[in-house]
Amino acid sequence: MDLKESVTSSKEVPSSVLGSERRNVIDFYKTVRGGATVKVSASSPSLAAAAQSDSKQRRLLVDFPKGSGSNAQQPDLSKAVSLSMGLYMGETETKVMGNDLGFPQQGQISLPSGETDFRLLEESIANLSRSTSVPENPKNSASAVSGTPTEEFPKTQSDLSSEQENLKSQAGTNGGNVKFPPDQSTFDILKDLEFSSGSPGKERSESPWRPDLLMDESCLLSPLAGEDDPFLLEGNSNEDCKPLILPDTKPKIKDNGDGILSSSNSVPQPQVKIGKEDFIELCTPGVIKQEKLGPVYCQASFSGANIIGNKMSAISVHGVSTSGGQMYHYDMNTASLSQQQDQKPIFNVIPPIPVGSENWNRCQGSGEDNLTSLGTVNFPGRSVFSNGYSSPGLRPDVSSPPSSSSTTTGPPPKLCLVCSDELSGCHYGVLTCGSCKVFFKRAVEGQHNYLCAGRNDCIIDKIRRENCPACRYRKCLQAGMNLQARKTKKKIKGIQQATTGVSQNTSENPNKTIVPATLPQLTPTLVSLLEVIEPEVIHSGYDSTSPDSTWRIMTTLNMLGGRQVIAAVKWAKAIPGFKNLHLDDQMTLLQYSWMFLMAFALGWRSYKQSNGSLLCFAPDLIINEQRMSLPWMYDQCRYMLYVSSELKRLQVSYEEYLCMKTLLLLSSVPKEGLKSQELFDEIRMTYIKELGKAIVKREGNSSQNWQRFYQLTKLLDSLHEIVGNLLNICFKTFLDKTMNIEFPEMLAEIITNQLPKYSNGDIKKLLFHQK
């Protein structure tokens, strides 16, 4: 039977809810959606009969019998309710969360008032599986289905008459409680429809829940009245990341054959949570889908006819689906949406694209409808506009503000470490200007004894550097300027150039025999290796602005000595042949000679930088006569000045200094000897010969070579006494805790190990000359 004929056949079924007149329609789905208001007319015969009968019954029962007038099997109540809510529950053990919705017991729907809400939905669904069979007689269905007597809620005659008066006075409006006679207390809203026999889920084409049976010319069951409403057309939307939900449209038929009726999205739908793995479709429009983190894009496949043709296109912005036919998703892309029956949306995951601009260019949907241009949003009934940007955040007409770094033309100029003038280069081992270079050279070679008129703290800058030569010279020494640094650099550079030139000539003429003039030009000597491994000058970090005191100076000297000992250990390990000794022998030699190395290096720096008049412990710590006058300072400074004065008197060269310093490392041994004594004697003799070569190189083939060798070796022997006196002062300071002089950890360990050996006389001095 056709839909229109089944609905408009009022002669066959006079008491049907689905009447031919629109004013007699009861919006059953509005009740399911959350309200319970029943719109009736005062002239309705069924309602009039309901008002005059059954004064004892208080609740209105709506029954869904299993059989209809055409003997067609009716859908179950749980499915009907679920379909009207936009969801299907495969099992009856379902928990409904959200709004307070419920059904009464035994599959009954009670409408006690115009604003009835279903409070017993959960119990009703749970009891549906245990409900008894419903008789085919619709008139007796109320007593058969309901397990309780109808006289449970008696009413008086006065209450019935008052309700009848209220009903008549409120005809055509949402009135109060509506009563029905016992013969019409249950509404079989589907018994007048002629359906084919069998379950509605058996055949999709014969399903009684098809939307074409629910939509007629007068929009029978839809809250949206209107013949030209585009949302009442058939269609299937497959949205990016989420299916589109349209109100009162054709439901999606799932694989199990059960029809699902999409509900109107004018009322928020409840959330459904089940405990079993059943198929549930939750149609909840207006919910923002939580996207995964990361630049992953969803792409939907659209097929079939458009929802409304070319009249309206969906908007796609930021992952929100709305009820007005608009879809929102990422990337500002628009496309016409189409819908195909019995087909789920196809989602494709596009992998992340590295380049930001390519993400906009390559993100597109598949289907018959092509996407519009990038950054374009189309609204129905409006002209198309575009933002004109190829990528977000990049605007061609707006330039980024200039940064502060762009205004600078280049890196800041480097300054002289002495006077803060513009730097001209590296002079005597320090980055200085040309003026300070010339000043330092003249001050050292001229052997001037500058004196400061103030407190040796004059300001040295570009303007006032000529005011005090003493402070300027002191600042040059503190920066680390040394005349010998330039000579050493030239020598090392010459050796490298000679070696490179020989290798190039050999590669160009491999068959040519090269006869070197002298052997040292080809093979680096031990002296040249000693020049390379010589440790750099270490700064002390002494604060010259604070008042001087014995405690501050001696503590600073001890800390500086600890760092110099560490540098001396590295230097000793780099000496050719030293690492071949036994490890215990290496440690013993370093413990016995650390004060020799410190005192001799101090004398050399003082001799080269101040001509032996000052003690240059570090570039930032120079002991002058004023500081020498402090308590406990004069005695040890006097011994140290002796070394620098002897170097000045003998005019020791740098090669001679390097050889003598190595011999001082090998100048003291234990009385019982070393574990590798033979190797030690061989190494020591090798460097004695190197000292002779350095003397010959300086003096030439002269008769004074042996005399100079005697003078230099005599100086080495005299250092044993000088170092012995310095060690006595150091030991006394270390043992006297009242002075509160600090010692670094490594230096304290060496002194602790060395004290008993010196006190017992277990040290053997290796002298060149007998006394």
From Swiss-Prot:
Q: Which UniProt keywords apply?
A: Acetylation, Chromatin regulator, Chromosome, Cytoplasm, Cytoskeleton, DNA-binding, Isopeptide bond, Lipid-binding, Metal-binding, Methylation, Mitochondrion, Nucleus, Phosphoprotein, Receptor, Steroid-binding, Transcription, Transcription regulation, Ubl conjugation, Zinc, Zinc-finger
Cite the record's Low complexity compositional bias ranges: 400-409
Region called Modulating, residue ranges: 1-415
Pfam families documented for this protein? GCR (PF02155), Hormone_recep (PF00104), zf-C4 (PF00105)
Which PROSITE patterns does the record match to this protein?
NR_LBD, NUCLEAR_REC_DBD_1, NUCLEAR_REC_DBD_2
> What family is reported?
Belongs to the nuclear hormone receptor family. NR3 subfamily.
Descriptive protein name: Glucocorticoid receptor
